Amino acid sequence: MAKEQLSAIPAVQMKRTFQAPREKAFRAWTDARELAPWFAPSAEYSTVVTELDLNVGGQYCIEIHHKGGNVHKVMGTYREIEPPEKLAFTWRWENDPSASESVVTVEFRDLGPATEILLTHELLPSAEEREKHGHGWEGCLAQLAKYL
């Protein structure tokens, strides 16, 4: 698919407020021990962080295990790391080698005892993928709210 067509698909954007300080919310995204308990679309899944090199250019790899036995593996490269304000990384599903790489940006706004998170997932290849990822991120952010 041409780059012009990819950019025509609107990004997934979500803004949520979490009852946790910004540093704690940022750590939940950047520490493997804190990421694993919540990073899945629902309680039907468990997560194993197999790699997390939190440096610009560093790689991450996350396995999301469904109770029914399916395993989904997502991986990518960190592009921006600005603790505790911003995190940006590429996103690619291993089980779909034809899938194009997309980009996730997470911004953390300090609200004192709370944190506003703005999540943007862009360069998704189709409206269908945008919808699937939107539902997935809704679930992940709900899990994060329970975790924090």
Q: What do these predicted ranges mean?
A:
Residues 22-23, 54-55, 79-85, 107-116:
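A short, structured loop/turn motif at beta-sheet edges
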Residues 30, 141-148:
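Short amphipathic alpha-helical signal-transduction/dimerization elements
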Residues 25, 35, 60, 78, ...:
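Hydrophobic pocket/interface hotspot
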Residues 9-15, 22, 47, 59, ...:
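Intrinsic-disorder/low-complexity, polar/charged segments enriched in Ser/Thr/Lys/Arg/Asp/Glu/Gln
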Residues 13-14, 33-71:
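Short beta-edge strand/loop motif at the mouth of beta-sheet-based domains
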Residues 88-138:
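Beta-strand/loop substructures that line and gate deep hydrophobic ligand-binding cavities in soluble
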